[in-house]
C-alpha cells in the first residue's frame, strides 16, 4: 500500500489515532501462572483459542507491552504499528471501492449494507419481507430479512419451521457481516437454479440479521476499527462497552466472561442488560416455530455447537456431532477449507452467557456458532468472497436441520388426509387459485388435478 493511496483515502499515516503505539505480538504461554499473569493485563486476545502451549496473538498498548517484557514471557512482535496496520486496511477498502468490483468483493458500511438489503427485499416482495428486530442502545435499527416462498397447499408460510441466522454481535468482525448478507441475498438469487436452496426456502422461514450490534459496527467505520463490544458507557460517561455474546441469560456470569468493564468479554451488569440482546430475545420468544439458529463470527475456521459454559456434553450431543460433520463437509466442498468442529467449550474456549447456549438451553433451538475464515478480525477484501461462498453452504445445512416433511394433500393441516381435503382442493382448482398450481408452471390445469389425486391417494408420509 503506497503512501499516495493512503493520503488519497484521507487516512492517518503518521501514527495518529486510537492504536498509536500499539502492537500485536505472538507468544506461547506454558504454565497457568504465565497465562494468568498475561490475562491480568486485560489484553485483547486476537487468537480465539488462548491455550497453554499453543501460539496466541495479543493486541497490546505500550504499557501492556512493557509489562509483558517485565513478566519475562518470550514473544515476537508481528505487527509493529497497529495504527498503521489499521490505516492500511482502510486504504485497501477505499481502493477497492474505487474499482469496479461486485458488492461482495469489498466491505460495506452500514448505509451501503442497509441499501443492499432493502434492494433485495424490493426485488422479491413475494419471497422477502423486511423484519425489524428492535433498536440498539443508540437507537439504530436492528433489521433483517425474512425469506420464505409464498404459501403452498399443505405448506403455508405461517406453519413452516423457522431458522435464524445472525452476524456481527462483535462489531469488528466484518467478514461475518458480509457473509450473512450474502446468504440472505443468494437464497433469493439461487432459488430458481439450486434445488437445495429452493427446497429450504419452500419449507422454512429463514430470518437473516446481518448486524446484531449496529452501534458497534458503525463505530468500527471510524477510528476504532478493532472495537468489539456495544457502545455502553458507565455512569461517568466513559465508553467501555458490553460483549453482547456474554450477555445472554443462560449460565450468565460464569467461566469465560468478565465482570471488569475494561475486559473484552465484559458481560454487563446483568443478563440481558443490553437492548440489543433484549431485542433478539423478544423476537425469539415471539416466534416459537424457531428450530435452528447460527451465530456467525470471525475468525478461526470452526463449526461449534453447545455448550460454551461447560465441558459437559448436551443431551443432543449425538445429533450435534453428526450435524457438525455434515455442515463442515458442505463448507469444505466449496473451497477445500477444513473447519474444526465440536462443542464451544472444548473447540474454542470456555464462554458463558453466549447466544448459542441460551437459544438451545432455554428455548430448545438447535443452535451453532460459526467462526469463519480469515487472518484475524480484519482480513483483506480478497478473503470476503471465499468466506461468503463457503459460509453459504454451511448455513444452508443449518437451515436444513429444521426442515420437516410436507404433506401437500393435507389441505386443512389437521394431520389427516380425508375427503374434506379433497373438497378444499377442488374448490381451489375450480377457482383457479394459485395454491392449486402443484407443478409450479404458473397455470392451474388438469395436470395439477391429477397430481393432487396421486398425493391424496398416497396420504401423508
Describe these PLM feature segments.
Residues 6-407:
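M14 metallocarboxypeptidase catalytic domain recognition
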Residues 1-4:
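Positively charged n-region of N-terminal signal peptides that target proteins for export
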Amino acid at each position: 500500500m503506497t503512501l499516495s493511496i493512503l493520503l488519497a483515502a484521507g487516512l492517518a499515516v503518521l501514527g495518529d489515532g486510537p492504536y498509536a503505539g500499539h502492537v500485536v505480538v505472538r507468544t506461547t504461554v506454558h504454565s497457568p501462572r504465565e497465562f494468568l499473569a498475561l490475562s491480568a493485563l486485560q489484553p485483547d486476545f486476537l487468537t480465539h483459542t488462548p491455550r497453554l502451549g499453543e501460539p496466541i496473538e495479543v493486541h497490546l498498548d505500550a504499557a501492556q507491552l512493557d509489562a509483558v517484557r517485565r513478566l519475562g514471557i518470550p514473544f515476537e512482535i508481528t505487527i509493529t504499528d497497529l495504527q498503521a496496520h489499521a490505516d492500511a486496511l482502510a486504504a485497501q477498502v477505499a481502493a477497492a471501492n474505487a474499482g469496479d468490483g461486485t458488492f461482495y468483493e469489498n466491505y460495506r458500511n452500514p448505509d451501503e449494507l442497509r441499501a443492499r438489503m432493502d434492494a433485495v427485499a424490493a426485488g422479491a416482495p413475494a419471497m422477502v419481507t423486511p423484519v425489524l428486530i428492535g433498536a440498539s442502545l443508540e437507537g439504530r435499527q436492528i433489521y433483517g430479512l425474512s425469506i420464505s416462498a409464498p404459501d403452498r397447499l399443505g405448506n403455508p408460510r405461517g406453519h413452516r419451521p423457522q431458522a435464524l441466522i445472525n452476524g456481527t454481535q462483535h462489531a469488528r468482525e466484518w467478514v461475518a457481516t458480509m457473509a450473512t448478507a450474502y446468504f440472505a441475498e443468494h437464497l433469493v438469487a439461487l432459488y430458481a437454479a439450486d434445488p437445495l436452496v429452493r427446497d429450504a426456502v419452500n419449507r422454512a422461514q429463514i430470518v437473516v440479521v446481518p448486524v446484531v450490534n449496529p452501534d458497534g459496527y458503525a463505530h468500527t467505520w471510524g477510528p476504532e476499527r478493532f472495537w468489539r463490544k456495544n457502545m455502553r458507557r458507565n455512569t461517568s460517561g466513559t465508553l467501555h462497552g458490553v460483549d453482547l455474546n456474554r450477555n445472554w441469560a443462560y449460565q450468565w456470569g460464569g467461566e469465560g466472561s468478565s465482570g471488569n468493564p475494561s475486559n473484552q468479554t465484559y458481560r454487563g451488569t446483568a443478563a440481558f442488560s443490553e437492548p440489543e440482546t433484549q431485542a433478539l430475545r423478544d423476537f425469539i420468544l415471539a416466534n416459537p416455530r424457531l428450530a435452528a439458529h447460527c451465530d456467525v463470527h470471525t475468525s478461526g475456521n470452526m463449526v461449534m455447537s453447545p455448550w460454551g459454559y461447560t465441558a459437559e456434553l448436551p443431551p443432543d450431543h449425538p445429533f450435534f456431532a453428526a450435524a457438525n460433520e455434515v455442515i463442515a463437509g458442505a463448507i469444505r466442498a466449496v473451497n477445500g477449507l477444513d473447519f474444526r468442529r465440536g462443542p464451544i467449550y472444548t473447540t474454542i474456549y470456555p464462554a458463558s452467557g453466549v447466544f448459542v447456549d441460551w437459544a438451545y438451553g432455554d428455548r430448545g433451538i438447535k443452535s451453532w456458532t460459526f467462526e469463519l475464515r480469515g487472518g484475524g478480525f480484519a482480513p483483506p477484501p480478497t478473503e470476503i468472497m471465499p468466506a461468503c461462498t463457503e459460509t453459504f453452504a454451511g448455513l444452508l445445512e443449518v437451515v436444513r436441520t429444521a426442515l420437516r416433511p410436507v404433506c401437500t394433500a393435507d389441505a386443512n393441516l389437521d394431520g389427516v388426509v380425508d375427503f374434506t381435503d379433497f373438497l378444499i382442493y377442488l374448490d381451489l382448482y375450480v377457482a383457479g387459485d394459485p395454491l392449486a398450481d402443484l407443478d409450479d408452471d404458473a397455470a392451474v390445469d388438469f395436470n395439477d388435478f391429477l397430481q393432487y389425486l396421486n398425493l391424496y391417494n398416497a396420504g401423508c408420509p
